[in-house]
């Protein structure tokens, strides 16, 4: 920045320096937000030329997390959406923000509701400045902020400004606190007789955004090696051809019921949707449900190794990668020596393992056979052929919803995948099940539930697409009719949820030839439609109950 000064020194020829341009004494250097290529590369552009196209400023577009729903199950005070001011609220600004290190300015918001004459209720939309926790606000406190109260029957869009209240000159692209747009249910949603089943009746809404004329970006990012951001996708494979992620078998059904266990801690089939593996989950089915280790003839203890033969580092993980996570049952295994150098005969050896005895400590690197191993010393690998009721205590039935004690106690095992539970209101976990051979006290199939198909885990590990929202909205579509059979949420923790249609009527069943399709990113407050109500042609789509 240059300035004129009367105190400027005289030039060499004696002329006064007044009126000449001289450098300012306290010139601030550009902040190196990222490695810069030169002093002129990362300079502020605010107040100069706004590089945002006028079309972007003049047109509203749907926010990436701008879908929300209101149902009679919501109560006053429930948060319908909670959006933070930033370039990520607008797809165009989100793309442009990758070229800059900072941003500043306001945005305009337009809210659309699917109004109709068969519903009544009001919502409140407020702007919560930084420093307030939006999740703890009451309805009365929400009215203290700039707000709009609207009827769900309104046909006109609701428009309001989202001001950039800040105590800094500009915002960097990291996640700094900014103004939040919060929508709550103000009065209960009530439906008339024309709406049919009120449990399945919801009012859908959309949030659209556009930058204000004062919105601008600052500090250009220096040119770097071109990088491509992968878009989030799910495998386009029918469910009937996918496999269980806790043991190798085709998926035989889905459990969609609130009566099923809603808190589980499986260690196989656990993967974040950005590709990070949890627990003992392998990336492919080649290592799944396998046990490998070394044992001496006449001994009972199998010293565990990884499936590929590498040493297992005790205390670093609950068990080797791919180690079975079946708890509350006895394992009956078939193992063979590797490499197999027998000239003839059956190389397989039958052994049994109890998972609730003191010798079962895979976290420490060993498990114990029920009987002495009277076969040659060596390196053995195998898998579980069938399971039975626990030997101790007698009379206990098989429970494949629980995991074994990996150490002397479950709390001693390190790096366990955390338990999961449905975070949304009225939601239930979705399980994919396959039957495993073995007797039980119920004289029924031993259904093994898992949270994700194995092909989904391999896909997420391969793609490693970034997570762009609180949850991914999936539709389960019948490929023959192209009809939507239900809405599901896929959370970043690697599990699906749905809203079962009815309570106490038994688990719902969907046809296994369907395909999950990614629709959009939604807020965790998004209210799912009950399964089976996304289309009026439920009878022809194969939705049925048992």
From Swiss-Prot:
InterPro entries: Calicivirus_coat, Calicivirus_coat_C, Rhv-like, Viral_coat. Residues 227-279 are annotated as: P1 sub-domain 1. Residues 417-546 are annotated as: P1 sub-domain 2. GO terms for cellular component: host cell cytoplasm; T=3 icosahedral viral capsid. Residues 227-545 are annotated as: Protruding domain. Residues 1-226 are annotated as: Shell domain. Residues 538-545 are annotated as: Plays a role in binding to host histo-blood group structures antigens and in the formation of P-particles. Residues 1-38 are annotated as: Disordered. It comes from Southampton virus (strain GI/Human/United Kingdom/Southampton/1991) (SHV). The keyword Chaperone does not apply. Belongs to the caliciviridae capsid protein family. Keywords: Capsid protein, Host cytoplasm, T=3 icosahedral capsid protein, Virion. This is Capsid protein VP1. SUPFAM superfamilies: Positive stranded ssRNA viruses. Disulfide bonds: none annotated. The record marks 228-229 as: Cleavage. Residues 280-416 are annotated as: P2 sub-domain. Pfam families: Calici_coat (PF00915), Calici_coat_C (PF08435).
């Amino acid at each position: 920045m240059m300035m004129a000064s009367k105190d400027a020194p005289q030039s060499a020829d004696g002329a006064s320096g007044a009126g000449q341009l001289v450098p300012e004494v306290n010139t601030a250097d550009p902040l190196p937000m990222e490695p810069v290529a030169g002093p002129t590369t990362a300079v502020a552009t605010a107040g100069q030329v706004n590089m945002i196209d006028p079309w972007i400023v003049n047109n509203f577009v749907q926010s990436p997390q701008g879908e929300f729903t209101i149902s009679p199950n919501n109560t006053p005070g429930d948060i319908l959406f909670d959006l933070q001011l930033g370039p990520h609220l607008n797809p165009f600004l989100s793309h442009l923000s990758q070229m800059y290190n900072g941003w500043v300015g306001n945005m305009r918001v337009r809210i659309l509701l699917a109004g109709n004459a068969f519903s009544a209720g009001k919502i409140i939309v407020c702007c919560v400045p930084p420093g307030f926790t939006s999740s703890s606000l009451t309805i009365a406190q929400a009215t203290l902020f700039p707000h709009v109260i609207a009827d769900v029957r309104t046909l006109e869009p609701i428009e309001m400004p989202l001001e950039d209240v800040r105590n800094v000159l500009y915002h960097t692209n990291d996640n700094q606190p900014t103004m939040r747009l919060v929508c709550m249910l103000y009065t209960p949603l009530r439906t008339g007789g024309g709406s049919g089943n009120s449990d399945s009746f919801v009012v859908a809404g959309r949030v659209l955004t556009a930058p204000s004329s004062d919105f601008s970006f600052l500090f250009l990012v220096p040119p770097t090696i071109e990088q491509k951001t992968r878009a989030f996708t799910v495998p386009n494979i029918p469910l009937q051809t996918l496999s269980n992620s806790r043991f190798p078998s085709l998926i035989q059904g889905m459990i969609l019921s609130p009566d099923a266990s809603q808190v589980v801690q499986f260690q196989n089939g656990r993967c974040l949707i950005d590709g990070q593996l949890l627990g003992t989950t392998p990336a492919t089915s080649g290592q799944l449900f396998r046990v490998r280790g070394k044992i001496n003839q006449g001994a009972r203890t199998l010293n565990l190794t990884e499936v590929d033969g590498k040493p297992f580092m005790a205390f670093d993980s609950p068990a080797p990668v791919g180690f079975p996570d079946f708890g509350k049952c006895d394992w009956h295994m078939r193992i063979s020596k590797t490499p197999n150098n027998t000239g003839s005969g059956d190389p397989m050896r039958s052994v049994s393992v109890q998972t609730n005895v003191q010798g079962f400590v895979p976290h420490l690197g060993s498990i114990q056979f029920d009987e002495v191993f009277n076969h040659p010393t060596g390196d053995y690998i195998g898998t579980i052929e069938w399971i039975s009721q626990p030997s101790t205590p007698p009379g206990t039935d098989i429970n494949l919803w629980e995991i074994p004690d990996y150490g002397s106690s479950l709390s001693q095992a390190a790096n366990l995948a955390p338990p999961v539970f449905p975070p949304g209101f009225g939601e239930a976990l979705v399980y994919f099940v396959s039957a495993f051979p073995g007797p039980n006290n119920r004289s029924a199939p031993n259904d093994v539930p898992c949270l994700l198909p194995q092909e989904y885990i391999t896909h997420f590990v391969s793609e490693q697409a970034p997570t762009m929202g609180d949850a991914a909205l999936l539709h389960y579509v019948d490929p023959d009719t192209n009809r939507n059979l239900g809405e599901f949420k896929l959370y970043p923790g690697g599990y699906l949820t749905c809203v079962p249609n009815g309570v106490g009527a038994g688990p719902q069943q969907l046809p296994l030839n369907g395909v999950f399709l990614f629709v959009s990113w939604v807020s965790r407050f998004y209210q799912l439609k009950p399964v089976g109500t996304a289309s009026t042609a439920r009878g022809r789509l194969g939705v049925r109950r048992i």
